[in-house]
Amino acid sequence: MENKKQSCLNVKIMTLAIFALGILFAYYTPAIAADKDQAQGLVDRARVTLNEFIRDPNYSWVRENLNHVKGILIFPQIIKGGFIFGASGGTGVLLVRDEKTGNWSEPAFYSIGSVTFGLQAGGEAAEVVMLAWTQKAIDSLLSSSFKLGADASIAIGPVGAGAKAGADIPSVTADFISFSKSKGLYAGLNLEGAVVAVRGGLNSAYCGKDARPADIIVKNDCSNRGSDELQRTLKKAGS
């Protein structure tokens, strides 16, 4: 009799466990799908942003120096006052260049946030491109988060007429060079003090498995055809 009761109890426990797992899976699966859609949307918007920079003669320095950089961070939209307490931020992608082949890695996903962003053009949002100029820049991006200006140096890149005067590559000493525009105009966004952090959920969703930045940009252990156009755009622009 005791064995029968124990057997019934075990069945009930198993049933409850399966039910609980079913609920968890029901909530978890849409979350993964949503992250994957968000990640692909960011990649697509990053390509649009990149094209806007490399086609704009005022930002010729970006295009002309893509074959010198270690990597590139593209933030399709940094929103001023878009977060609690009026802080600003956005999410973007990092791609790293293979210096031997000129090919670009799959994208890794990052957020950027600060309470001090100021948009000189008066806009509420800006598109931002950050060129990772040194190995220290890449090493910083392999950590879970870091602060621009403290853990890695950053400078605003030359724009317009200043692009020619600032084109002397040996004079570049910053780890990151940033460029920003708002509604097609120069935004002059100062990113010093901003915190850049890994978006682990988006990385894993885009790669279809648990993936850290090192897995994506160092080990090349990630493959997604959704980034093909962005990679081709970068390689063509830098050739």
State each model region's role:
Residues E2-A17:
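Bacterial N-terminal signal peptides that target proteins for export
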Residues K4-Q6, L24, W61:
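A general, composition-driven signal for non-globular sequence regions
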Residues F25-A33:
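Sec/Tat signal peptide C-region and signal peptidase I cleavage site
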Residues T15-A26:
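Bacterial N-terminal signal peptides
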Residues A34-S239:
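Small-residue-enriched, tightly packed secondary-structure blocks
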